[in-house]
C-alpha cells in the first residue's frame, strides 16, 4: 500500500507480553475486547509476534519519502497505519511481527538506526522507550527515592531513564532470584 515499506527483520526481542500472549492468549483477547483495547485477534489462529525489532528496508512503496531507501536500517512503532485504521503488528492474524522474515511497516513511523548501532541494540528501542515514557509520566523529583519493582528489560530501562535524568536514589526489587 502507499506509504509502506517491505522490510527484512534483522533482530527481534522477546517481550514478556509475547510470553503472556503465548500462554494466555484467549484471556488476553477477552480482556482487550471488554476494555476496548487494541490487541483483538483470533487466539485460535496462527499469528507471528514480535514488536521489539530492527529491520532493513527491502522495497519502498509509492508515497514513501525520498530519504528512505532500500538498505536503510530502521526501527518502528509496532503498528501499521492504513486508510481503514491502525493495525497492530505482531498481535494480529494478518500483520506479522518481527519474528517473521519480512513484514510491512508504515514509512511515517520509521526511525532510522544511526551511528553504527547494531541491530540487536537497536531492537531495544521499544523497551527503552517504554521505560523512558514511564519516567516522563512520573512526578519524580531529585529529592525522591525511586522504587522500581521488576528488573526485567523494561524495569532496567526505567532505572536507566531515572539515572539519565539524575533522579534517585533508585531502589530495585524483583521476585525472580535470577534478577
Question: Whereabouts are the PLM-identified features?
Answer:
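Hydrophobic/small residue at the entry helix of a nucleotide-binding pocket
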Residues: 130, 154, 162
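Glycine-rich beta-strand-centered segment in the early N-terminal region that forms part
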Residues: 1-12, 27-80, 114-116
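Conserved SAM-binding motif I beta-strand of class I
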Residues: 172-173
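Short cysteine clusters
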Residues: 15
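NAD(P)H dinucleotide-binding glycine-rich loop of Rossmann-like/cofactor-binding domains
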Residues: 39-51, 74-149
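Conserved S-adenosyl-L-methionine
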Residues: 164-169
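Conserved SAM/SAH-binding beta-strand->alpha-helix loop
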Residues: 176
Amino acid at each position: 500500500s502507499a506509504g509502506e515499506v517491505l522490510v527484512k527483520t534483522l533482530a527481534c526481542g522477546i517481550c514478556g507480553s509475547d510470553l503472556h500472549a503465548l500462554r494466555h492468549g484467549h484471556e488476553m483477547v477477552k480482556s482487550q475486547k471488554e476494555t476496548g483495547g487494541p490487541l483483538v485477534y483470533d487466539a485460535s489462529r496462527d499469528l507471528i509476534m514480535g514488536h521489539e525489532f530492527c529491520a532493513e528496508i527491502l522495497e519502498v512503496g509509492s508515497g514513501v519519502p525520498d530519504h528512505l531507501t532500500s538498505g536503510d536500517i530502521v526501527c518502528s512503532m509496532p503498528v501499521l497505519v492504513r486508510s481503514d485504521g491502525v493495525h497492530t503488528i505482531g498481535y494480529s492474524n494478518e500483520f506479522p511481527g518481527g519474528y517473521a522474515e519480512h513484514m510491512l511497516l508504515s514509512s511515517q513511523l520509521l526511525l532510522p538506526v544511526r551511528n553504527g548501532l547494531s541491530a540487536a541494540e537497536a531492537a531495544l528501542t521499544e523497551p527503552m522507550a517504554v521505560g523512558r515514557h514511564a519516567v516522563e509520566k512520573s512526578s519524580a523529583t531529585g529529592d525522591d527515592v525511586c522504587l522500581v519493582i521488576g528488573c526485567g528489560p523494561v524495569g532496567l530501562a526505567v532505572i536507566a531513564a531515572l539515572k539519565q535524568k539524575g533522579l534517585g536514589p533508585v531502589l530495585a526489587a524483583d521476585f525472580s532470584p535470577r534478577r
